């Protein structure tokens, strides 16, 4: 009827339906609704992580900076910035910056190179992983984690390379060798493992057969061990001390053994929040890679189980977002982020419990790190945005 006014929202929905009918048929995407269950778990883990960081870092903050809240305040500020980033990114269609991903990849690679340049890169605890800025120390490897997922997802979505054949995998392998090689030059083994895991996960989800990947891993494992022994005496000492951590409790095994003491003393119910003994100069940097040991000490087996269940719920929800994504690109980006969460969580807990050699992997949401928490929350924003576009059955 002439003169009839249609709501703008209805017009936009009709346009989306019309576009969906052009070309390949797709399911109708619902817009505007994020996965609130996923968001709730993220907020819960972030809050839990900040509380545990405050408890674990208070003695070190008081000793090193005469302020028990020193590490907490910095982490809290970065968490606020991360939440703002998460909210903004959750409202930007993830396809809008799809074509910018190659530029992100170039920038992140340049930053990894800059870390290796004396005067630009900062060396701490024997590793050169950070760049100094007026506000905080940036860790470029944290930026590379989501970018490698988006870059590989874009490559798969382009359809240029058939991942079912070896030739189609070569461009991905080449990119990964460059990135992982730069990170190994920084002596950042843990970051290299995580990024390689993210890349391989996206490749497998994109069509790479699993069997060749497993064969390649079995071939590379002994080569990697030989390389570690030849190039890094410190890291080889970590491997050998893993075999029998109590044989050398004053040197390479010291942190692992103190972490095991913390886990064992927690029992089932823990010593109580804030009541850890090991964080008082016994366990080095308890607010970093070994914060899970403090969780076990203060909250016991029950508290540790709650943390593990929360991470499991988050990862399962992220996989669900990947399965319901409306396109290949969104699905593979979600797979990459879910893989990062899973790899880091499993490795961190495995290191804390001396199930694998000490690699220095941070526990998401819990371990101290400004760049890490900001980047992680922005990644959660990407997943929330993908969930806005999830398809209806």
Please provide the spans of the model-predicted regions.
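TM-adjacent membrane-interface loops and short helices in multi-pass inner/ER membrane proteins
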Residues: 241, 245-288, 292, 302-303
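Short linear Ser/Thr-Pro motifs
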Residues: 55-58, 276, 367
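A juxtamembrane structural motif centered on a specific transmembrane helix
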Residues: 1-30, 346-393
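Glycine/serine-rich anion-binding loops at beta->alpha junctions
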Residues: 134-144, 185-187, 267-272, 361-375
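Transmembrane helix boundary and interhelical junction motifs in multipass membrane proteins
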Residues: 188-193, 271-276, 286-288, 305, ...
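Hydrophobic alpha-helical transmembrane segments of multi-pass inner membrane proteins, especially
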Residues: 41-47, 52-55, 62-255, 293-354, ...
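N-terminal membrane topogenic signal
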Residues: 29-42
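Short, small-residue-rich loop/turn micro-motifs
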Residues: 57, 263, 267, 353
């Amino acid at each position: 009827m002439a003169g009839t006014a249609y709501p703008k929202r209805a017009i936009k929905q009709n346009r989306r339906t019309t576009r969906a009918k052009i070309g390949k048929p797709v399911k109708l995407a619902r817009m505007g609704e994020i996965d609130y269950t996923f968001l709730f778990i993220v907020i819960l883990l972030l809050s839990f992580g900040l509380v545990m960081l405050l408890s674990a870092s208070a003695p070190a903050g008081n000793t090193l900076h005469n302020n028990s809240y020193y590490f907490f305040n910095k982490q809290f500020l970065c968490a606020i910035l991360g939440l703002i980033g998460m909210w903004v990114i959750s409202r930007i269609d993830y396809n809008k910056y799809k074509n910018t991903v190659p530029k992100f990849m170039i920038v992140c690679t340049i930053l990894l190179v800059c870390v290796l340049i004396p005067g630009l890169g900062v060396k701490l605890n024997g590793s050169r992983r950070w760049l100094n800025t007026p506000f905080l120390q940036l860790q470029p490897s944290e930026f590379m984690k989501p970018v490698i997922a988006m870059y590989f997802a874009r490559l798969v979505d382009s359809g240029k390379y058939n991942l079912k054949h070896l030739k189609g995998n070569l461009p991905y392998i080449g990119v990964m060798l460059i990135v992982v090689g730069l990170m190994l030059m920084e002596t950042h083994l843990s970051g290299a493992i995580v990024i390689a895991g993210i890349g391989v996960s996206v490749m497998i989800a994109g069509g790479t057969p699993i069997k060749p990947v497993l064969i390649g891993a079995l071939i590379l494992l002994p080569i990697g061990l030989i390389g570690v022994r030849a190039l890094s005496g410190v890291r080889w000492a970590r491997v050998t001390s893993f075999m029998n951590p109590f044989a050398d409790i004053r040197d390479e095994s010291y942190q692992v053994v103190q972490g095991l003491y913390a886990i064992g003393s927690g029992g089932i119910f823990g010593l109580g929040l804030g009541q850890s003994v090991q964080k008082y100069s016994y366990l080095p940097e308890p607010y970093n890679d070994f914060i899970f040991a403090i969780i076990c000490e203060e909250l016991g087996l029950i508290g540790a189980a709650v943390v593990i269940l929360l991470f499991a719920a988050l990862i399962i929800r992220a996989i669900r977002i990947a399965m319901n994504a409306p396109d290949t690109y969104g699905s593979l980006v979600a797979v990459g982020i879910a893989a990062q969460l899973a790899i880091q969580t499993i490795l961190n807990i495995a290191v804390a419990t001396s199930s694998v050699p000490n690699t220095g992997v941070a526990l998401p949401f819990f371990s101290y790190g400004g760049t890490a928490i900001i980047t992680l929350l922005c990644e959660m924003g990407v997943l929330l945005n993908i969930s806005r576009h999830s398809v209806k059955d």
